[in-house]
Amino acid sequence: MSTPRSPSPWPRAHRALPLLLGLLGCGAEGEKDVSGDEDEQAADGGGAADGGAPTTDLTWHQDIAPIFSQSCEGCHGATGGGGGLDLSTPERAAEWALPIAAAVEARRMPPWTAADDCNSYQGDFSLSAEDRAKVVEWARAGAPAGDPATAAALPPAYTPPVLDRVDLQLELPVEYTPDPGQPDDYRCFLVDWPWAEDAWVTGTHIRPTNEAIAHHVITFLIPPEDVATYEALDAADAAPGYPCYGGPGGDIDSLQTMRWLGAWAPGGGAAVYPEGTGLRVRPGSKLVQQMHYNTLGGPGADRTVMDLRVETTPQGWADIQPWTDVRWVLGVGMDIPANTEGVSHEFRYRAGAGDRFAFHNAALHMHTMGVSASLHVEHADGSETCLLREDSWDFNWQRTYALTTPVNVTPGDEIVLRCTWDNESDQNAAWGEGTGDEMCLATTYITDSWPED
């Protein structure tokens, strides 16, 4: 089968950059963001308003429980997916009512940061303006429970997709205990690919065995010709795995050929790729699991497992395609001056004669100076399609948004990536991996052109 060339006009070194993805889940640090600042929680008493609260006709059983069931309990239910805080009962919700109101009003919760007017996405658990107002009013009125005998019907909670079968299960080569002396431990582990024939990965589900310390995982696919480079990195460190940040390590040549295979963040479920498409893996390849452990969750060990749905019959071409300006990666052109607000930079890529592909999802990545970011297509006919826009960037909540309808790109279209930052520090910033550095990156799952409805 023919393989379309990558639309990227630059070397693929930028594939090795960090992206804290929530595949289709709740993201990281759920409990912290729900409850708000500890001082705020203490001031509020950690619960419903005291005397003098305004009155309301809204109650938990009649009005609020359906909202929570659909948009909150995927993370904050009795068996929530990584949020850590159970808000499935009127008693628990009332206990946290005022912090909940603050988080909902500020749009920190639920952690759905895609702009409402950009596009439509699968599994949208965001709150409408009307539902936000209801939650805030109910909380500030003392979080009344209402009558359970006349409770409204509860819609099902959003749950991430699951693999319909698992053809291959891989795990870290050893159980690893992160260094408790540092809050963040980035560690890469080389994992053998056991199949002796061409294969196409059509779905992934990454499952850390200790979610209390696992912050995120990125799986990189290393082609056979570059395996020796990563084996040398692994052998050079006496401890399990080897240290890494921003990618799997490797030299500039190997970073041009490695690809992304999957990613995970707390609350995330399986990534199921579009029907008839898959990521090709050649015999002799290896995987690198980049683990980001956060030891603030307590001590402990982890041995992350990766479930894969795999086809041995050829699938339609697909790639996890990053977008950024290679000049930024090389330290040119993405200057963010000290003590300056509203600094924006933009990257454009014009689709050439051979570029015909479809976007199926999109994710954006910046660091903590980020204010807003967007990815859109300016079509040759003058129309424009927004893929993803995040107007209030939150470093703690980064996820991949799966488009309800794929967006086709044809020759002459332009893909436009734009990022804006506020640099409140006394140091100039530019592209880099440190906490005082910044990035502007988008990643997308692309395939051959997709039939339009």
Please describe what each predicted stretch is.
Residues 1-24:
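Sec-dependent bacterial lipoprotein signal peptides
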